[in-house]
Amino acid sequence: MANNPIPVYVFTGFLESGKTKFIQEILADPNFTENEVTTLLLCEEGIEEYDEKWLAHYGTALVPIESEDRLTPNILKRIEQKYNPDRIIVEYNGMWKLESLMQAFPARWELYQIITTV
């Protein structure tokens, strides 16, 4: 398992376009989260917020990333080591360059999907 890729799902879009709600619906879907650990990187805060107890029920750890300069390979690798996720979901800040995130991916992180809400 140590060498298996970790799928990364990136949600991007305008502020208040429904990213958080959409992610919550996906996490609540048993076909998506069955017995797997998810790390949710939160790169922006809108009106809709996550309840950490609710997330824990679905095997999800919330990790805030408060600025684009915190997207470094070292920081993301430490997150991977700390949480040992089966998958990573990123609620990305639409004002940040997507390239910043992609260039910071540790070796095992593999982009599976980019979802844009409007």
At which residue positions do the language-model features occur?
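Nucleotide-state-sensitive switch-loop elements of NTP-binding domains
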Residues: 2-12, 16-17, 21-118
